[in-house]
């Protein structure tokens, strides 16, 4: 399908882009910005923000929307990774950091302990930085979710990704709509600020998106993002875009989500779960405690 006129990526500050790339390379860490071919990479890097990808760059799952490599990481976890991520954050002086990972079904805790270690390392090395984690589902393990929350992230995010009907088509067979809701519910019950994201343009209806938003509010999610699905390049498993959702429809989703009680909503054609993450966090704070 031909790209519509509203799908346009803005360039960022070239100097900041180079600085982020150099710091990431020097630290030997991965970013989801590069691994997932995010359309906002130059905009975000130009603003001096980045989403770090931990636990390697090989995912044990094969969702049909994601460009990250799939395979068997063979249980490897790099013990130096927390310190290296923290050093990159400190070197860049980032005020808001997003930490995400590949799925690691090969690990007993799904990688939760590494998330906790990275959060603690960043907080120790860059105490000024707010930290958002974007975790996999950890197989629905309450213990894994608790270990990450207890590390003290400022936001706990886990993406629902799509509507209930399309979940078996869009996500890996080991993923579950209800398990994702349960993960978010567990994090909220432990006192975390919670966040989730949805993609549209995969064949869902408007009412199905509203139903998914309602399901997220039922587990008291604070922040939600809604963006257009863009097919990654290079692999036949990736789903085709079924529809280009116009900007005015995203505005309707935003209005509906705000009416449901979400404290911050980021919706638009190029929105991804980590896009404008700092702004969404600040908006959530303003609505929660009047800051």
UniProtKB/Swiss-Prot annotation:
Pathway: Protein modification; protein lipoylation via endogenous pathway; protein N(6)-(lipoyl)lysine from octanoyl-[acyl-carrier-protein]: step 2/2. It catalyses: [[Fe-S] cluster scaffold protein carrying a second [4Fe-4S](2+) cluster] + N(6)-octanoyl-L-lysyl-[protein] + 2 oxidized [2Fe-2S]-[ferredoxin] + 2 S-adenosyl-L-methionine + 4 H(+) = [[Fe-S] cluster scaffold protein] + N(6)-[(R)-dihydrolipoyl]-L-lysyl-[protein] + 4 Fe(3+) + 2 hydrogen sulfide + 2 5'-deoxyadenosine + 2 L-methionine + 2 reduced [2Fe-2S]-[ferredoxin]. Its main location: cytoplasm. One of its GO terms (molecular function) is metal ion binding. Binds 2 [4Fe-4S] clusters per subunit. One cluster is coordinated with 3 cysteines and an exchangeable S-adenosyl-L-methionine. Keywords: 4Fe-4S, Cytoplasm, Iron, Iron-sulfur, Metal-binding, S-adenosyl-L-methionine, Transferase. The keyword Iron applies. The keyword Metal-binding applies. Its cofactor is [4Fe-4S] cluster. Belongs to the radical SAM superfamily. Lipoyl synthase family. This is Lipoyl synthase. The lineage of its organism: Archaea, Thermoproteota, Thermoprotei, Thermoproteales, Thermoproteaceae.
């Amino acid at each position: 399908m031909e790209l519509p006129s509203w799908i346009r990526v803005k360039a960022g500050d070239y100097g900041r882009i180079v600085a982020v790339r150099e710091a990431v390379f020097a630290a030997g860490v991965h970013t989801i910005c590069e691994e997932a071919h995010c359309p906002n990479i130059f905009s975000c890097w130009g603003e001096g923000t980045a989403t770090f990808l931990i636990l390697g760059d090989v995912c044990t799952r094969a969702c049909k929307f994601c460009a990250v490599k799939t395979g068997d990481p063979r249980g490897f976890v790099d013990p130096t990774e927390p310190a290296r991520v923290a050093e990159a954050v400190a070197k860049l002086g980032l005020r808001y950091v997003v930490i995400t990972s590949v799925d690691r079904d090969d690990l007993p805790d799904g990688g939760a302990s590494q998330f906790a270690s990275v959060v603690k390392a960043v907080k120790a090395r860059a105490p000024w930085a707010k930290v958002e984690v974007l975790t996999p589902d950890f197989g629905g393990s309450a213990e894994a979710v608790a270990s990450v929350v207890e590390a003290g992230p400022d936001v706990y995010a886990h993406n629902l990704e799509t509507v209930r009907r399309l979940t078996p088509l869009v996500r890996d067979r080991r993923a579950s709509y209800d398990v994702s809701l349960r993960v978010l519910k567990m994090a909220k019950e432990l006192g975390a600020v919670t966040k989730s994201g949805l993609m549209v343009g995969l064949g869902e209806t408007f009412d199905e998106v509203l139903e998914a938003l309602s399901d997220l509010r039922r587990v008291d999610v604070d922040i939600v993002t809604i963006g257009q699905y863009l097919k990654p390049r290079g692999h036949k498993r990736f789903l085709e875009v079924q529809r280009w959702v116009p900007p005015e429809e995203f505005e309707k989703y935003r209005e509906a989500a705000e009416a449901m009680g979400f404290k911050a909503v980021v919706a638009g054609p190029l929105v991804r779960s980590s896009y404008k993450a700092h702004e969404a966090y600040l908006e959530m704070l303003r609505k929660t405690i009047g800051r």
